[in-house]
Amino acid sequence: MDVSKAVDQRISTRAFLPDPLPEAEVREWLTQAQRAPSGGNVQPWRTIAVTGQAKDDVIAMAAPILAADPRGQKTDRPIYPKDLWEPYEARRRRVGEMMYEALDIPREDRAARLAWFSNNFRFFGAPLALFLVIDERMGHGQWGHAGMYLQTLALLAEERGWGTCFQECWGCLLYTSDA
């Protein structure tokens, strides 16, 4: 598969087969992604992969937090800037509307929307979850390099026929937990 095709067909996958990915292939994928651009070769990211029981433990850790607030806890690191401005807010709302329309969940059915949203905290059934960690002291450039690493992971996953879904929502739990 060429890069253009991988870019064109990559989507956020929200339904996964339960089959585990071969560990050797996962290691190869993660190693290859380390070739992502990084100024000064700083590679400011750390990737934590969880599968099997470890993944189940992470999901279980999230359960009591989500029982208190299905959207996660409030943090000083919101997913979106406060009072997101146009045209960004319209884009964000439209993609949400399209997703819930495709799922046949009406706008007024808040309970069904929150139930669907809670699938984020079960990784949509994916057999592998990755957490990207970066030291907060890193500058804007290094955060950008981490983004290039994530894009590289996504495109290499697409090449392998693996779906991906980037989930910032976990930050609402992990920044405020002992995880």
Model-predicted segments: where are they?
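N-terminal amphipathic, basic helical "cap/leader" segment at the start of enzyme domains
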Residues: 1-120
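Small-aliphatic-rich amphipathic alpha-helix that forms the alpha element of a beta-alpha
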Residues: 29-35, 128-174
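Extracellular/periplasmic catalytic domains that process cell-envelope and extracellular macromolecules
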Residues: 122-125
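Conserved small/polar residues in nucleotide/adenosyl-binding loops
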Residues: 175-179
